[in-house]
Amino acid sequence: MIFGTPNSTFLENRLGSSTGMPFSSATSLNSGVDQMMNELNIQQPTSHTVLFDLSWEVAKKVGGIYTVLKTKAPVTVEEYKSRYALIGPYNASTAPTEFEPLIPGPLSSPIIENMMKKYGIHVHFGKWLVEGYPKVFLIDLHSSMHKLGEWRWDLMSGFEQAGDNETNETIVFGYQSALLLKEFAEANPNDKYIAHFHEWQASVGLILLKKWKVPVSTIFTTHATLLGRYLAAGGVDLYNQMQVLNMDFEASKRGIYHRHWIEKKSAADSHVFTTVSEITGYESEHILMRKPDVILPNGLKLDKFTALHEFQNLHAKYKGVLNEFVRGHFYGHYSDFDLDNTLYVFTAGRHEYFNKGVDMFLDSLAGLNKLLQQSGSKMTVVAFIIMPAATNNFNVESLKGHSYLKDMRRTCNTIVEAMGERLFEATSRGKMISPEELLSQEDLVMLKRRIFALKQKSSGPPVVTHNMINDNDEILQHIRRIKLFNSQEDRVKVIYHPEFLTSTNPLIPLDYTEFVRGCHLGIFPSYYEPFGMTPAECCASGCPSITSNLTGFANYMSRALQDTDSKGIFIVDRRFKSSRETVDQMTQYLWKFTQLDRRQRIELRNATEKLSELLDWRTLGKFYKTARALALERAFPPKPISRSPSPSPSSSLKLSTGLSNQIELQQQQQQQQPQPIGTTINLIPPSSNVSVTPTTTPTTTTTATTATTAPITTPKPNVIPINTGKENITLLSPNSMSSLLSDSLNEFKKQQQQQQQSKTPTTPTTTSTTTTTPSTTAAATNKSVLSNPTPTPSPNTSSFIPTNKGSTATTTTTTATPTPTPSNNTNGKPFNPIEALTKSNSSSNFATTSTASVNTNNGGTNSPVSKSIPIPSSKSLK
């Protein structure tokens, strides 16, 4: 796994640390990525590299992926220019404001025409109306809905859900996008294509590209696993039970196995699998059965947040708007509200009561209220909850209070203007005017009426600003349970605003970014948060925040900073502490924050705002570059190094796995300095697959066997052990690694000689025989049984329920064209830089024999159900 540097310790420690590998600044983070890319020697994009981003949210705002693609677009367009485009479904309702049609160029025009002529698929070409104006291909789903039944059966026959409209549209879009990419690859065979699929709704096309053997390198990013979100929302202790749950069975119980299968299969089939955080990577390891190759943290477009020296002035400006809201909401109910001793805290996001940690947020507010009351503090804390829920209108009491306040302000402005005229008239005549003459009787009457109206509020300050349709809303029920009703003696006031903020809001006329700048503290103790854009936006706005160690943002920042508290990022422990302990920890954070004076809060805001560079796409975009380069390396490996066979019998064996290349590489590096700590993980795995090829006849036979090397138990003087809490990670110097590789080579030669002497081949775990002729054609039969196969659904049931009885299905053998087979890292093995180097030197001109094996054993899964999906002909798709 790659995250800043290849040596990632967070997953090995199983989420137990809140202070990971330190980076002093964004500069060190960048240099770590650059150094890693240089060491891996992976391919960089050229003028013949074309990049596509595929998502359900291209030019259509649905969730957070829209923000990721939108803010990342300027940086990607700057890098790829016209060689970058996005692919998404066409939406007639959002297209007028998000999409501008363009005339296709000479490259795209024939492809779009072929899509209509061959398959009847209508593709809209144009530009996305966001900064950078990237080109987009929006595909009309309705033009292929008549093929839904055929495609659905072809993809997942036996366990499909015909009534799932979202999945039906996902399947149609998947086939359409795969056919579009296939047309590009066939029309321009000299170009190298990278297709980056975001989330399972867009990834059916990835599965099809793999089945059809289309020469396109693929990346799959899960921003949150589908089943993980279901389990967390259902109250399952996800991170403690993840290792014992049968994920396929859990998905079947919830009626989402067909969706889960798409996500799991996409992770297995992609050349590079990525997630947005290490916590999601740990989750994917158990739910999708594959560790991520690269971590891609979400970034922000900092131009939107940049304020430099003005950010404190902006805080004062937008805090003034919040002060105006507080006056209208609370004034008239009680008169001891001191705005100079008032702090504004908030939480925001989707209405997910448990996943977003709203329960702990409210419990900590109740604890803070007691502490402030017991200490006799004059500080008032106003806590906002900005989460959308079903409403039918604004609360009448809220509107009345703001209406009275606006009327009061207009009256005061009128009186002040009249007083100014009187004062000017008197002084211009050389007369002094008494205070009684400044304020007329009419003015006094008007003021008394306004004050009387303001005090005629029938009830206390409302907790909710709108009329809720669901009176049993979980947030409302919790507020009633802790009895925070905004009474006068409460030092903590709660404002539940069940609607996203806009500048046209009659109560709080601020955009969300402006609202964040006006607040003092953001609180996001989420239980399930793959990354967490809300605390990231707080950081970019100079607003300190509280988050949990189960969020991707906390993972990222704890690795980048040695002391997060001093930078305004407070991380509570939801992994190893009980709920009560976590609430107490958060209450203490809030209590300490209320004890800061104004100067200390300003210094904390300054420290937080300086971290924004860590979240800039120009910093985080390098992780995307790494993922793309790695995908190119696996999909299009370089040509092998040609070497002449030696006449000596003892040296006439060539290691086709690239082990000899490793030795040669290490010999070249012996004169160089040893590598620094943190550049290599598991250089010598416990087992290796080695192919030995005799060079005696023109026709060569390659036999793959499984050999095991002895584990390294005692480090040599030049071997540095690193304790990660899960396994030892050893960093080897070039001399020691060359020695170990030579020992491995001798061991393999010894085994080969023993096999030749006994003339009885040893039965390996998995044996495959490939005969290569000078014409590079091959025919072979390969039968294998997966150790942890994916449950095969019964064709007689619409909702698949895995069973505990195993039965092996028919094994299918197909002969592929001379195409390199990339390593997908589906066995959960961590990223190996040396392995990547040797793969880059392996031969790409050979015929392969592909074997698919399906076993219905419920003992676990290593890869999703493998189904043969033929390339549909143009005739069948018309």
Curated annotation (Swiss-Prot):
Top-level taxonomic group: Eukaryota
Main EC class the enzyme belongs to: transferase
GO biological process: autophagosome assembly; glycogen biosynthetic process; sorocarp morphogenesis
EC number of this enzyme: 2.4.1.11
Bias type Low complexity, positions: 641-656, 666-676, 693-715, 746-781, 795-830, 838-878
Signal peptide feature range: none
Record's keyword annotation contains Chaperone: no
Cellular-component GO terms for this entry: cytoplasm
Pathway membership: Glycan biosynthesis; glycogen biosynthesis
Biased segments, Polar residues type: 677-692
Record's catalysed reaction(s): [(1->4)-alpha-D-glucosyl](n) + UDP-alpha-D-glucose = [(1->4)-alpha-D-glucosyl](n+1) + UDP + H(+)
An MF annotation (GO) of this entry: alpha-1,4-glucan glucosyltransferase (UDP-glucose donor) activity
Region (Disordered): 637-721, 746-878
Keywords: Glycogen biosynthesis, Glycosyltransferase, Transferase
Family stated for the protein in its record: Belongs to the glycosyltransferase 3 family.
Role: Catalyzes the formation of apha-1,4 glycosidic bonds adding glucose residue from UDPG to the growing chain of glycogen.
Stated name of the protein: Glycogen [starch] synthase
Gene: glcS
